[in-house]
Amino acid sequence: MTEKTPRKPASFTVSQASNRPEAADEAPRRPRAVRDLDVVVAQPDVFALSEEEAAELEILDPSFEAPERKGWSLSRILFGALGILVSFAIGIWTEDLIRALFSRADWLGWTALGVAIIALAAFIAIVVRELVALRRLASVQHLRKDAADAAERDDMAAARKAVDALRSIAAGLPETARGRQLLDGLTDDIIDGRNLIQLAETEILRPLDREARTLILNASKRVSIVTAISPRALVDIGYVIFESARLIRRLSQLYGGRPGTLGFLKLARRVIAHLAVTGTLAMGDSVIQQLVGHGLASRLSAKLGEGVVNGLMTARIGIAAMDVVRPFPFNAEKRPGIGDFIGDLVKINGERPDKKHPGK
């Protein structure tokens, strides 16, 4: 076979005719309707909120921290003095009772003394348990502030300290096992303080936040249904108070607070103070019309509207309790709002007209 000689390099001239200027002279196609496609007409949602109504709902969201009162107030001094006097009165009455029983019979006196010692031991145990619960709640509040400060300053050492405290609080919660295991593997890694706080919030608190949303929604649904079927307003108020108190306690237990009786009272006071900072607690007919607009209020009957109002109030109390008992502030995760629950509450208390009467 003979080898072919390579072609010598040469130059070529590009013709300007390739631009096809005649394409620009073509007339545009006339618009015409397409009739062979199925046209789907969107049906408006009668319970959908407008942007203005949703913005008004978000105003109710308690996203501010209630200021803590420091020092001794007159009410604390009064109740403290009364408590000391009552303790002295109980002690003197117990002593007189034991002396009187000893004067009657020795075995009665010794029995009364033993019962008094048992009662005193049980009282001391209750006081210690309440103090431990109060200390646990205080540690959660301090951890919340430390985490916010570490994330703001991007301090890695402070962030690791806050994350370690969060892991110790969540050690007994099975929902956080996977997140704690992930953070255990990052002990020797170099991570920025803000990113470490966000990672701990995502991996540890996200399952708890999901469960907290479920608790708030279920409590709001129960309040809404009971309000809609109860014959007396007093029953509505009593059930709202009962359900709100149970919701506050369950949310605190969910995040590892486990409050006692005194701890629950202090926690409830913080939640009420938290709500007082962000607005009024009571929501009447005029307030709910300002919140969700006159359109939604006119779509529901009076009793069903009251159910939605009480359900929203319960949801707002739950969100405020979530803000108070959550160890870390909302940073990486989205904070729940009133608008996240109103759709479910409305669906419970009323059906859409097209679903209720499909033939009309």
Curated annotation (Swiss-Prot):
Quote the Pfam families the UniProt record gives.
DUF697
Map out region (Disordered) in residue numbers.
Answer: 1-30
* Entry's localization field: Cell inner membrane
Topology relative to the lipid bilayer, per the entry, is:
Multi-pass membrane protein
Q: Which UniProt keywords apply?
A: Cell inner membrane, Cell membrane, Membrane, Transmembrane, Transmembrane helix
TM spans (from-to): 77-97, 108-128
Q: What is its main location?
A: membrane
Q: Which GO terms describe its cellular component?
A: plasma membrane
Family from the record: Belongs to the UPF0283 family.
- NCBIfam families under this entry? hyp_HI0043
This protein is called what?
Answer: UPF0283 membrane protein Oant_2119
Q: What is the lineage of its organism?
A: Bacteria, Pseudomonadati, Pseudomonadota, Alphaproteobacteria, Hyphomicrobiales
